[in-house]
Regions:
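Alpha-helical segment of the N-proximal tetratricopeptide repeat
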Residues: 3-40, 44-57
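Canonical tetratricopeptide repeat
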Residues: 10, 44, 78, 85, ...
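Helix-start (N-cap) detector for alpha-helical repeat units in TPR-like alpha-solenoids
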Residues: 5-6, 39-40, 73-74, 107-108, ...
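Terminal, low-structured helical/coil segments at or just beyond the last alpha-helical repeat
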Residues: 1-5, 11, 135-164
């Protein structure tokens, strides 16, 4: 008996939860054999590839999702993160801007935007966005204090005012 896509999704998630990303990847591949444009399987596969540091490959899967659903917020956020991690901050910022056009107060997009701005040496802009996102979600204040992306500005007086 063949497993249904729903059963396969549950199995893949269980494998991920128990620390078996390769097994989960195999399950998501099975789903994609059955349904090549299955959004959840494409996103999960992109996530696994991203966690394995294979950002270029992850982006391919997020692009496939966006080919089906151009306003898929999760795919846009994850694609932005993948570009951020490979140092292509402007493309990452473009992804976050697309999310913010759909959901202007999306905390993840705003926080990631601040991070990419700082990493691209646009410190003042990044600090403004960081300050704005902290107004929406105070937990971002604590997160920013310890975020590796902000280590280069730890001694910046404006950053210290925002996070301390």
């Amino acid at each position: 008996m063949n497993a249904t896509i729903e059963e396969l999704l549950k199995s893949g998630q269980m494998l991920l939860n128990t620390g078996n990303p390769k097994g989960a990847m195999t399950v998501y591949d099975k789903i994609l054999e059955i349904s090549p444009n299955h959004i959840d399987a494409l996103i999960k596969k992109g996530n696994i590839l991203g966690k394995l540091g294979k950002y270029d490959n992850a982006i391919i899967y997020y692009d496939r999702v966006l080919g089906e659903e151009s306003q898929n917020i999760l795919a846009l956020l994850n694609k932005g993160l993948a570009y951020h991690y490979i140092g292509q901050y402007q493309i990452a910022l473009d992804c976050y801007e697309q999310v913010l056009m759909i959901k202007p107060r999306n905390v993840t997009a705003l926080y990631n935007k601040a991070s990419s701005l700082v990493k691209s040496k646009r410190i003042e802009e990044g600090l403004k966005v960081l300050s704005d996102v902290i107004e929406i979600d105070f937990s971002c204040k604590v997160k920013a204090k310890f975020d590796i992306d902000f280590t280069s500005i730890q001694k910046n007086n404006e950053f210290r005012k925002i996070v301390l």
